[in-house]
Amino acid sequence: MSDETATPGADQAPLIINGQYIKDLSFEVPNAPRIFAELDGQPEVPINVDVTATPVGERFFEVSLKFRIEGRIKGKVAFIAELDYCAVATVNLPDEHIHPVLLIEVPRLMFPFARNILADLTRDGGFLPLMIQPLDFAAMYRNRVQAAQSQAAAENAAAN
């Protein structure tokens, strides 16, 4: 006989991606058709990305990878692409590891699919496919944690 105590969730995978889906998708070419006459290459495309995680159930979360991209040619808006790409994930890890896994690892797994959707979307919209370089979700997470800590410190200083 063994005296070993089973760890809860030890027989389960630490991370399960239950599904991925497009929650919201929008593409606009507000200056069409004139903008295509000015098209002589890839537009300037600043990319805004946000990652959020929302609990759905116990150890069950929706992770959202949101992109907002506004392509410009000679200062004019060529296109606006918005994508809210989500995954439903089950996380079987100790509580202190859940937040980083949801905001670093899950988006890292989702990113290639979202990038492909955006490349197809811009191509089908009449532009060159937008090839987004891999994102550093760990750096994004660190920046978010530092910003939250700075805000908390500022609030504490103001309260005293």
UniProtKB/Swiss-Prot annotation:
InterPro entries: SecB (IPR003708), SecB-like_sf (IPR035958). Coiled coil: none annotated. GO terms for cellular component: cytoplasm. It is found in: Cytoplasm. Pfam families: SecB. Transmembrane segments: none annotated. Its main location: cytoplasm. GO terms for biological process: protein folding; protein tetramerization; protein transport. One of its GO terms (molecular function) is unfolded protein binding. Keywords: Chaperone, Cytoplasm, Protein transport, Translocation, Transport. PANTHER family: PROTEIN-EXPORT PROTEIN SECB, PTHR36918. Belongs to the SecB family. One of the proteins required for the normal export of preproteins out of the cell cytoplasm. It is a molecular chaperone that binds to a subset of precursor proteins, maintaining them in a translocation-competent state. It also specifically binds to its receptor SecA. Homotetramer, a dimer of dimers. One homotetramer interacts with 1 SecA dimer. This is Protein-export protein SecB.
